[in-house]
């Protein structure tokens, strides 16, 4: 798909409006970095990233929990916005559709009622074809969401994927013993995605026996409950994303369910293992580096309408892989 890149002039103002979910936030951050690398002056609207803005000096990070899309559209040449903000505005009686310089991105599906495929996005009088889009255009293609957001940047915005992006900067130094420290994120916002606490305890015991220092990570609201489930281990909880980023600088490996912790770890260059019932090439696996593995069940079966998968997770794949890294 050939794209005329003439729309993007050096210094052009672009706002990228993310959503609260950590995994999605990492994708919008990557898109913001790509736009900055192409010469745009980028404002990233993200409440989760605002406390960590000192690590994002190349972007203007705004922490609005409920962004004013109308105001952003008036202040920027282009706004790329997570679809939920359009939905929420519509429910509140605010019509954002006349804003012709706002492009909406959804994960896998654009809501039909807005008929976005019939609306053009224009920047300085130039039409950006297909700017309203889903990030993942084909969930069976085997691509990660990182690869999909890069394709959007390349095919819709005309950005060169070979241009290096800035990444996080001015981070705390990596801990001296990080190569033997591992963080487990045992929960997600969706209980059906969570691996069993018994399985995580077994994994932690095996890793400790092999010389790893294992700690767990949850939200502040989960911390007390998780500490009861994992009494032999430190359970960390952080009030903001900066605290979590600082903690992960003390680790080299993240084990998680299908959750934001794995995406953040991957973004930071850590080795990740994602425990999920889904197939190994599922779209939402971490994909920011080459050291991401999906641990999925050897088989599953249905019982009383539920998929049984947790007993069949091959945890040995994790400690075997880490043993090879240590050699």
What are these regions (language model features)?
Residues 1-327:
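Catalytic machinery of carbohydrate-active enzymes
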């Amino acid at each position: 798909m050939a794209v005329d890149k003439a729309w993007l002039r050096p210094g052009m103002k672009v706002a990228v409006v993310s959503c609260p979910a950590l995994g999605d936030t990492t994708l919008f951050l990557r898109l913001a970095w790509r736009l900055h690398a192409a010469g745009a002056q980028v404002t990233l609207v993200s409440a989760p990233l605002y406390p960590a803005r000192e690590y994002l000096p190349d972007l203007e990070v705004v922490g609005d929990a409920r962004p004013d899309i109308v105001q952003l559209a008036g202040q920027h040449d282009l706004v790329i916005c997570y679809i939920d903000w359009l939905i929420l505005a519509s429910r509140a009686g605010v019509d954002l559709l006349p804003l012709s310089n706002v492009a909406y991105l959804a994960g896998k599906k654009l809501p039909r009622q807005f008929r976005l495929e019939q609306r053009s996005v224009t920047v300085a009088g130039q039409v950006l074809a297909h700017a309203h889009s889903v990030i993942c255009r084909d969930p069976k293609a085997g691509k990660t969401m990182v690869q999909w957001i890069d394709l959007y940047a390349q095919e819709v915005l005309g950005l060169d994927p070979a241009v290096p992006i800035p990444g996080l900067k001015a981070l705390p130094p990596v801990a001296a013993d990080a190569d033997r420290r591992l963080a487990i994120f045992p929960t997600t916002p969706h209980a059906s995605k969570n691996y069993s606490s018994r399985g995580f305890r077994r994994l932690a015991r095996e890793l400790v026996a092999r010389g790893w220092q294992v700690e767990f990570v949850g939200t502040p609201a989960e911390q007390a409950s998780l500490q009861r489930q994992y009494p032999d281990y430190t359970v960390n909880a952080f009030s903001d994303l900066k605290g979590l980023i600082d903690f992960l600088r003390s680790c080299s490996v993240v084990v998680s369910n299908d959750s934001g912790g794995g995406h953040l770890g991957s973004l930071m260059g850590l080795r990740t293992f994602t425990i999920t019932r889904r197939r190994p090439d599922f779209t939402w696996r971490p994909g920011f580096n080459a050291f991401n593995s999906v641990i999925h069940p050897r088989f599953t079966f249905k019982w009383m309408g539920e998929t049984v998968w947790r007993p069949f997770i091959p945890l040995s794949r994790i400690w075997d892989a880490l043993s090879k890294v240590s050699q």
